[in-house]
C-alpha cells in the first residue's frame, strides 16, 4: 500500500481551540482552590476541554461529568446531577466548591439545575454531609450562545454573586486575568508588586506552571480561595482583560465601587496603559524600575523591527484577551 501526501491549497490556519461556553466555565473552576466542576452533559463536553487544558499547560486537571446519555435526554437527566454530586463529595473530602456547568443538550431539554441545587442543599448535603462546607453553584452556559470567552464571563459573574458580600472596603484591587498563561499572572503580580499595590488575584492560575517534585507533592490547582471572593466585595475593581465582563458589572453595581477595563498588557510594551490605571485608583506613582523595563522592551522591539519586520503586514489571531494586548501598542 502506498501513501501519497497532498499539500492543502489554503494559506491560512484553522484554529481548533476556540470552543463553546462550558470551556470558559471550566477554566474558571480550575482556578478556584478546593473546587471541582461538574459538567452537566455528555462526557465529551468535559473530556475535550480537559484535553485542551492538559495539552496546553502540560498538567492534569480534575473536572467531572454527569455523563448524560440518551435515556436522560428522553426521561430527564436531573438525577445524574444528584448522583454526580454525591459521588464527587464522597471521593474528594476536601472539595468545597462544586459548580454545576450546563451544556447545549441540558439547556435545550430545560433541566432545572437551580431546582436540583436547592433540593441537594435541603436534602443530600444536610443528611449525608451535615458538618461539611459545600457550595453548589449553577452556571448556565449553553453551547449555542457565545463562546469560551463569554463562558468565562458567565462563570465569573455566578461565582461573584454566590460568594461576594457588601462590607467595608479594604483598599485592595481585584485582578481578573481572563484567558492567560501562568507566566502572565506572575508578570502581572510583579507589576503590582513594583507599584506597591495590594491586589486579590481571582481565579488565579500561576501554580499551573508547577515544578516537578520528587515526592509528587506539588500539583496544579487554582489558588483563589472561595473565601477570597468574600473580600471581592470589599474593594475597588481593577481593569480586567476585556471590556465586557458581567462579573465586573455585578460586583461594581452591588457594592457601588469603581470598575475599569483595559486590554491585557502583553509583556512590557503596554505599560503605558497598565500603570496609569492603578495610579488613578491608588494614587501611587509609577516606579522608575517599570519605566526602565518598558524602555528595554521597546528598545528590543526597535532593534528587531528595522531588520525583520520593516514594511511587513501581519495577521494576529487568537483569544481576544491575548490579541488585544499583542496588537494594541
Curated annotation (Swiss-Prot):
SUPFAM superfamilies: Helical backbone' metal receptor. GO terms for biological process: nitrogen fixation. Keywords: ATP-binding, Iron, Iron-sulfur, Metal-binding, Nitrogen fixation, Nucleotide-binding, Oxidoreductase. Residues 257-271 have a biased composition (Basic residues). Binds 1 [8Fe-7S] cluster per heterodimer. Its cofactor is [8Fe-7S] cluster. The keyword ATP-binding applies. Transmembrane segments: none annotated. It catalyses: N2 + 8 reduced [2Fe-2S]-[ferredoxin] + 16 ATP + 16 H2O = H2 + 8 oxidized [2Fe-2S]-[ferredoxin] + 2 NH4(+) + 16 ADP + 16 phosphate + 6 H(+). InterPro entries: ChlB/BchB/BchZ (IPR050152), Nase/OxRdtase_comp1 (IPR000510), Nase_comp1_CS (IPR000318). One of its GO terms (molecular function) is nitrogenase activity. Disulfide bonds: none annotated. Its EC number is 1.18.6.1. [8Fe-7S] cluster binds at residues 20, 45, 104, 143. The keyword Zinc does not apply. Pfam families: Oxidored_nitro. Hexamer of two alpha, two beta, and two delta chains. Belongs to the NifD/NifK/NifE/NifN family. This iron-iron protein is part of the nitrogenase complex that catalyzes the key enzymatic reactions in nitrogen fixation. Other nitrogenase complexes utilize a molybdenum-iron protein or a vanadium-iron protein. This is Nitrogenase iron-iron protein beta chain.
Amino acid at each position: 500500500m502506498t501513501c501519497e501526501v497532498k499539500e492543502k491549497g489554503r494559506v491560512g490556519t484553522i484554529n481548533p481551540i476556540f470552543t463553546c461556553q462550558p470551556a470558559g466555565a471550566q477554566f474558571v473552576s480550575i482556578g478556584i482552590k478546593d473546587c471541582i466542576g461538574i459538567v452537566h452533559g455528555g462526557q465529551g463536553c468535559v473530556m475535550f476541554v480537559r484535553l485542551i487544558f492538559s495539552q496546553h499547560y502540560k498538567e492534569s486537571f480534575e473536572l467531572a461529568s454527569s455523563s448524560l446519555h440518551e435515556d436522560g435526554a428522553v426521561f430527564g437527566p436531573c438525577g445524574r446531577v444528584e448522583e454526580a454530586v454525591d459521588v464527587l463529595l464522597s471521593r474528594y473530602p476536601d472539595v468545597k466548591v462544586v459548580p454545576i456547568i450546563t451544556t447545549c443538550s441540558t439547556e435545550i431539554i430545560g433541566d432545572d439545575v437551580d431546582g436540583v441545587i436547592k433540593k441537594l442543599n435541603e436534602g443530600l448535603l444536610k443528611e449525608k454531609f451535615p458538618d461539611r462546607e459545600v457550595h453548589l453553584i449553577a452556571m448556565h452556559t449553553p453551547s449555542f450562545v457565545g463562546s469560551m470567552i463569554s463562558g468565562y464571563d458567565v462563570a465569573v459573574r455566578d461565582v461573584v454573586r454566590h460568594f461576594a458580600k457588601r462590607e467595608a472596603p479594604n483598599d485592595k484591587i481585584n485582578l481578573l486575568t481572563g484567558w492567560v498563561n501562568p507566566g502572565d499572572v506572575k508578570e502581572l503580580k510583579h507589576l503590582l508588586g513594583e507599584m506597591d499595590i495590594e491586589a486579590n488575584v481571582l481565579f488565579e492560575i500561576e501554580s499551573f506552571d508547577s515544578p516537578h517534585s520528587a515526592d509528587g507533592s506539588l500539583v496544579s490547582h487554582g489558588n483563589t480561595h472561595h473565601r477570597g471572593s468574600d473580600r471581592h466585595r470589599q474593594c475597588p475593581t481593577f481593569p480586567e482583560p476585556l471590556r465586557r465582563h458581567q462579573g465586573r458589572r455585578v460586583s461594581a453595581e452591588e457594592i457601588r465601587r469603581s470598575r475599569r477595563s483595559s486590554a491585557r498588557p502583553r509583556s512590557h510594551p503596554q505599560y503605558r496603559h497598565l500603570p496609569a490605571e492603578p495610579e488613578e485608583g491608588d494614587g501611587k506613582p509609577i516606579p522608575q524600575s517599570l519605566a526602565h523595563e518598558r524602555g528595554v522592551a521597546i528598545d528590543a522591539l526597535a532593534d528587531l523591527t528595522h531588520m525583520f519586520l520593516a514594511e511587513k503586514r501581519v495577521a494576529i489571531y487568537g483569544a481576544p484577551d491575548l490579541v488585544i494586548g499583542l496588537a494594541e501598542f
